[in-house]
Amino acid sequence: MIGLRPAFSTMLFLLLLTGGVYPLLTTALGQWWFPWQANGSLIHKDNVIRGSALIGQSFTAAGYFHGRPSATADTPYNPLASGGSNLAASNPELDAQIQARVAALRAANPQASSAVPVELATASASGLDNNLTPGAAAWQIPRVAAARQLPVEQVAQLVAEYTHRPLASFLGQPVVNIVKLNLALDALQGHRAK
């Protein structure tokens, strides 16, 4: 019995440390140093949560920029079912999905003459990606401008404003947060696109 006492004491100490002290400390520090990020990077508009800056949304109307396809099961951009499709590059089903997406994108963007950007035709690994490259956003500018009856230059300027560039080029590539961009489009016109 004497040999069990140190083992039990150590187990109890580590249980309290890792199951209580550490989670409470990291939560408190997160709330103190990074409150916006620790609470999900939620985007509020008129005291209503409109989304998260970290999770994409399904935008299908012509007046909105469309994000990457979501591979989540049942509902697009479902954070509870995060994950990729797990289809291998050699899988004919993946090829068929990509061809169908490219055809749909071409039909929805008849003004676009260049090739469909890869990220608009392929789902991300998480299925929740909210960012596009500036090139993929620019590819959609003519459609969005026409649907909203805005000058192409004005929509292009908005894309440039919402392009986030890393501190140094080796730290990543420029990205456009589609959720924030679409909310800015709504704010610009004072309403939602149809």
Swiss-Prot record:
It comes from the Bacteria. It is a single-pass membrane protein. One of its GO terms (cellular component) is plasma membrane. Its main location: membrane. Keywords: ATP-binding, Cell inner membrane, Cell membrane, Ion transport, Membrane, Nucleotide-binding, Potassium, Potassium transport, Transmembrane, Transmembrane helix, Transport. The keyword Disulfide bond does not apply. InterPro entries: KdpC. The keyword Transmembrane applies. It is found in: Cell inner membrane. One of its GO terms (molecular function) is P-type potassium transmembrane transporter activity. The system is composed of three essential subunits: KdpA, KdpB and KdpC. Part of the high-affinity ATP-driven potassium transport (or Kdp) system, which catalyzes the hydrolysis of ATP coupled with the electrogenic transport of potassium into the cytoplasm. This subunit acts as a catalytic chaperone that increases the ATP-binding affinity of the ATP-hydrolyzing subunit KdpB by the formation of a transient KdpB/KdpC/ATP ternary complex. Belongs to the KdpC family. This is Potassium-transporting ATPase KdpC subunit. The lineage of its organism: Bacteria, Pseudomonadati, Pseudomonadota, Gammaproteobacteria, Enterobacterales.
